[in-house]
Amino acid sequence: MSRILKSLSRSYSTTSPRLYVDVVQGLYISSLKSYKPKAVPSETAAEVKEWSMPSAPTAPKYDVDFTSALNSYKYEGETIPTKAAGESNKFDFLESYENEKEH
């Protein structure tokens, strides 16, 4: 007898969460439809400043003569250090070696 009651109770069960979702959704939609935004008072319009275009920037003017400054600089000597005859570089393995035998 208990097997029959269990099978009958399963067939008559309803899903209450679906009904709950519809009620909540209905309340939410009705509150959205009834919403009316507040009117903006004219006082807030006075608080906003009018936008004006900024003035165009001007190029700076210097009193220095750049040509004479560049001519006064002269490249003197070699500034790149050279390696000694027996000294090896840690990046020597990156150099490509030429194959003496032709294919």
Curated annotation (Swiss-Prot):
GO BP term, example: proton transmembrane transport
Function: Mitochondrial membrane ATP synthase (F(1)F(0) ATP synthase or Complex V) produces ATP from ADP in the presence of a proton gradient across the membrane which is generated by electron transport complexes of the respiratory chain. F-type ATPases consist of two structural domains, F(1) - containing the extramembraneous catalytic core and F(0) - containing the membrane proton channel, linked together by a central stalk and a peripheral stalk. During catalysis, ATP synthesis in the catalytic domain of F(1) is coupled via a rotary mechanism of the central stalk subunits to proton translocation.
Annotated compartments: Mitochondrion; Mitochondrion inner membrane
Gene: atp14
Listed PANTHER family: ATP SYNTHASE SUBUNIT H, MITOCHONDRIAL
UniProt similarity note: Belongs to the ATPase h subunit family.
Database matches in Pfam families: ATP_sub_h
This protein's UniProt keywords: ATP synthesis, CF(0), Hydrogen ion transport, Ion transport, Membrane, Mitochondrion, Mitochondrion inner membrane, Transit peptide, Transport
Superkingdom classification of source: Eukaryota
Assembly information from the UniProt record: F-type ATPases have 2 components, CF(1) - the catalytic core - and CF(0) - the membrane proton channel.
Name of the molecule in the record: ATP synthase subunit H, mitochondrial
Keyword rRNA-binding found: no
Gene Ontology cellular component list: matrix side of mitochondrial inner membrane; mitochondrion; proton-transporting ATP synthase complex
Species of origin: Schizosaccharomyces pombe (strain 972 / ATCC 24843)
Transit peptide residue numbers: 1-26
